[in-house]
Amino acid sequence: MKVLLFCIVISLTTLIASGQDIEEELRCPGGYCVSKYLCPNGTFIDDIKRAQTTQLIGLRAGLDIDDFDVCNDYLLVCCQSAPAPTATSTENPANSDELIEPPPSTNLACGQANEGGLIYDLRNNDTLSQYAEYPWVVYILALKKQSNSGDFVCGGTLIHSRLVVTTAHNTDGKTDLVARFGEWDVSTTKEPFPQQDIDVAEVIKHPQYVFNPIQHDIALLVLAESVQYAAHIRPICLPQPTDEFVGQRCVSNGWGKERGVYANVMKKLTLPVIGRANCTRMLRYAGLGPFYALREGFLCAGGEDAVDMCKGDGGSPLACQTESGTYVLAGIVSWGIGCGGFNTPGVYVAVNRYVQWLNEHIVDQALNESFDIKL
């Protein structure tokens, strides 16, 4: 009886696997659905619904699969030959989820984006970042007790191999924080390069931080160990105390809400930095009343129709590019009225006002680290 039951289980498993193989064969005839980086150059099948002629990924809001995603997974491509083997994998390539080691970061300068991203290319895309495009953005979680999982807390920015900067209010009442580096799409584990999860050993809030009315909303997360820099994990540069960004269009990233739903793929919004007087006027008309004045330590960005950061984006960076192409951390998402919109800018921590405080803690922690800063 036991032998018969064992045979039935084996048969069912074989049938399921065969069904999966047949389904994949129909989607990707003569090939395998694999991660793009496992497919040798030039071996994309190029006669299926035009999808592989462009070697671009179709992606819409909410990660819907469009008509050109023949593998039913936007991170997979139809590859006409067996994929390139990895050093540790001997599995059937169609079933392999092996990650490859990312190339080391040969450019040790801070503030260097991967323009256009790595590996993938999202098409028809205006508000999502490319994979590893902004390697300093950090996904911060709070671990659940008696569980290996965690809840998303906020965004952060890598400024040093042991330091992440974020907003103070997002850390209020939070314990067991973990900083995740190299995150992009929170709905999948099929990203090509491995993430690094590192415990937060200490949270250092600005000594003058006040929640209500909010002031000096900045905090440092000291990591339990150094993050390992790679092509998809690199720090951003800090600004100079005298830097001003009014009139520039800068980039903000995060996984906050969009149309009421938290984003899976890291967002990318390009926003104008607005002068203090203009921002104060806009916020007064937006509902804060005729006597409101923007406090020192904040700057404003946005104020455009249907483009702004939202709930869940707190702590995320506002990065501005210098003439040389280097990015500096101009702001940190702090607060706003609703999710912003036309004539309702978002409010960010003005990082240039806190550079001295940040540098003092870098010295106090004996964490001196030199970069080739291209200004």
Put a short name on every predicted segment:
Residues 128, 132, 189-194, 210-215, ...:
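Gly/Ser-enriched beta-turn/beta-hairpin loop segments
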Residues 154-155, 168, 315-317:
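Beta-propeller and closely related beta-sheet repeat lectin domains
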